[in-house]
Amino acid sequence: MAAKKDYYAILGVPRNATQEEIKRAYKRLARQYHPDVNKSPEAEEKFKEINEAYAVLSDPEKRRIYDTYGTTEAPPPPPPGGYDFSGFDVEDFSEFFQELFGPGLFGGFGRRSRKGRDLRAELPLTLEEAFHGGERVVEVAGRRVSVRIPPGVREGSVIRVPGMGGQGNPPGDLLLVVRLLPHPVFRLEGQDLYATLDVPAPIAVVGGKVRAMTLEGPVEVAVPPRTQAGRKLRLKGKGFPGPAGRGDLYLEVRITIPERLTPEEEALWKKLAEAYYARA
């Protein structure tokens, strides 16, 4: 049996942490260990572990079960007052003896096909997983199930896995409801992505190129001269995929100034300030 994970320790929060504290810790760690930012060998595994912990602790019901049992699956409760045979089905009895002695002996019971119940479960995904799609192995009711995730899947989308639900003839299906985890960099609205772009003050004034992150990796973005803070730069076709094509990525400019200056750089900034005051 795999060792139980301490999700609170993974996120670095106490067991009585509020949802807001859990969310802040998740965002901080996700930003620190995001594979596009952190190139250390263990970053990708750590990033997955952080997302797994947040998927449980951010859900009140999953957190309650985890706090009670140390796992996300609660054991079935014992039947109160002994065993109850009120749900006994003659069909099940018939099928049992037909398996032992063949269909002829107990054919009088009759046998009807009854489809198994559909099972519903939550599927937490990072934006990267939802964007790229691919294969994912999930554990539901003690079973490991391979799931194909279509690219561009959205919050609330339902992925149906045929035949992996409740027992029956035929078996029911497994319905996985997509839940997108918060991302430390991007915000998804419709098919469009939104993020902040840090632009050094000199480049904002005279124009130039800066590096920006997308869900497909880093790209260079052209910054027009005299770009003001708050301006949105649009990267066409860099958003989420959908039936009508790709959405766009909007980068909101945030002007940054250097925290440390060499004597020469400070002298240049002073000259710029003097020129500004002289013109004003």
From Swiss-Prot:
Keywords: Chaperone, Cytoplasm, DNA replication, Stress response
Gene Ontology CC entries for this record: cytoplasm
InterPro entries documented for this protein: DnaJ_C (IPR002939), DnaJ_domain (IPR001623), DnaJ_domain_CS (IPR018253), HSP40/DnaJ_pept-bd (IPR008971), J_dom_sf (IPR036869)
Gene3D superfamilies: DnaJ domain (1.10.287.110), Urease metallochaperone UreE, N-terminal domain (2.60.260.20)
SUPFAM superfamilies: Chaperone J-domain (SSF46565), HSP40/DnaJ peptide-binding domain (SSF49493)
Gene Ontology process terms (BP): chaperone cofactor-dependent protein refolding; DNA replication; protein refolding
Pfam families reported for this sequence: DnaJ (PF00226), DnaJ_C (PF01556)
Oligomeric form and interacting partners: Forms a heterononamer with DnaJ and DafA in the resting state. Three copies of each protein are present in the complex.
Record's protein name: Chaperone protein DnaJ 2
Lineage, opening ranks: Bacteria, Thermotogati, Deinococcota, Deinococci, Thermales
